[in-house]
C-alpha cells in the first residue's frame, strides 16, 4: 500500500500589538502627558507622573506595570470598580481602565 500524502495548511501569522493610552478622563492629565505644566496638580509630582504615564503607554499587559514594585498596581473597588491604579507617591495615583490591552480614561487623582 502506498502512503497517502496529507496536505498541511500551515499559516504563520505575525501580530503586532501596539498598546497605548487611548483616552484621558481629565484635561489636566493630558497636559502633563504632553509635557506641559498643570496648575491643578502639585509641581513636585508632575515629572514622576509623566514618567509613569509613559510607562503605562508602553505596557503590553498589566503585568508590565507590576515592575517596579513601587507602582503597586491595584484593581480598585467601590465607585472605581473595574479601574486600576498605579502610585505616583503615597497620596497621588494614576487611575485607568484596561480594555483590550490599552489604557482608557486615564486620570491623575487623589481619591482618598
What are the roles of these predicted feature ranges?
Residues 1-88, 92, 99-112:
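Basic, Lys/Arg-enriched alpha-helical interface segments
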